Amino acid sequence: MIIGIDVGGTHTDGVLLGINSPNGEGYEILATSKVRTQKDNLMKSILEVLDVLLAAAQVPDIKRIVLSTTLAANVIVEENYDPVGLVLIPGPGLNPEHLLIGDENILLSGYINHRGIEVRDLEQEELLKGLERIKARGIKNLAIVSKFSTRNPGLEAEVLQLIREKDYPFENISLGHQLSGRLGFPRRLVTAYFNTAIMSVYRDFVQAVEKALEERELDTGVFVLKCDGGTVPLDRVMEAPIETVNSGPAASIMGTMAMTGVYQNKETAIALDIGGTTTDIGLFIKGEPAFMPEGIELNGFPTLVRGLYSLSLPLGGDSKIAVKDGKLKIGPERDGPAAAFGGPSPTPTDALLVLDYIQDDPDYEGRADLQAAREALVALAGDLDPTEYGRCWQDGKLDLTEFASFIIDKMLASIVETIQEILASLENKPVYTISELLAGVEIRPQLLLTMGGPASALSPLLAEKLGYREEVVPYAKVANAVGAALARPTLQTTVRVDTAASYLHIVEAGIHRQLKAGEDYDLEEVEELAMAWTRKRADDETAVVEISERESFNVIRGFRTIGKIMEVRAQIKPGLISRPEGSEN
């Protein structure tokens, strides 16, 4: 059996999957669970989900548990993290002033060149003064990033060593070279900055998971979904938590792929997960999820974190509705649950209840206080400028149904506008899927695939505005947890060989060494080395590994070739281990 759990900002969802085929490859959904996320007590939320799922398993033989979460992503979007200091070693040729995104920034002398050779040493006095400045401000989080550190991490390691020797009180530290094997100094420092920023949040998350499993005496493999739709073991998450920052949207996309026929039918579609806090938007092109191999963006900053293409709109069923200067405003804040469930502010969920769109839903029926929803909306309408919202009044009286309809129209208009902006931004650009680069492809979605609590109510309305066919994903309220449960483990390894300098780098494995006497490589051998190390790091000698990038060029000196520089990236491609019974064919 497999358990998938998605820890969202509003709800924690879970599914229990059991094998239903003789060869052990097919799965069926045995049980589901959905509880409110208690941010100050994650262990309790996870335990509540586990208890429901384990109770449904007559013989709880759990082989694998996979989790996804939006907690870290929400922290970044809301900028609700502790200050981070940046130690930058940029070297020549780049004005670093526009890179200073830390709460305190140190620019150091010394640098590594593009061949990985240390050209200039660090100046220790300069470094110590900078660290003292960060310490004086009480900053506990630090990111250390040197240009070309993937080709020689020596300067980053030297800074870390001095911090430890002097016993500086930094609690969370990221080194740029440990987060990606690819070049890109600006992207690397942003990646290191946000990796440090979410370390505390992820440490709490990992500890909550470990305690929950210990409470229920579960001794099994535990994984976390990454941004690229693959998984990483829980005990390795803290090596680079930034890789899982968008695991919530990735779970939605993988769940859509698992539970619908979009992949089999090679369709181009928009995927929506309408949650309580956000609406996550994904894109399928000819049946495969769109991919960002250069790196996702976080708060408008490009990173080196490879991931599925997604955009989280801070708009959901529990978004706070307010009136500012006589105008209606929905989100981005969430002020608790809907008024119908005891929350302090009206929300789109209250409007849906007033319109009787979700009244018969088992999750709302009998629990929702419809009168509280009505009263919250009536109180809100009193502050509106009637000249702009005339349709909501009839003969000087508020038409509550019309007002609720206006709220939902405004919410849908925001989602539709964002989808159209996404498609316009991709027009005439090369796009990637998890399998290939597509050049010159027209992205013309005809299908809308929706999941989340209000999906059944909102999907037809959205599809009408977009002019698409629509389909509510089976098990729409927990399909994200299905996507997490069935995601395949993934891994990427970068190998760089410089035969002229006689040096070998296996970046993600932390290997940077001189070539031994008689040790030589051609491009094919570098590819074999990259694939072998990918399997080794995944601890799976049977894993299917592919070469995602390769380059090779001669090193010329004095009009003659003195060696080659070869760089190869190998990866286990993201995908599903199976599709569950009951999904669309």
Language-model-detected regions and their locations in the chain:
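N-terminally biased helix-coil "hinge/interface" segments that flank
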Residues: M1-N585
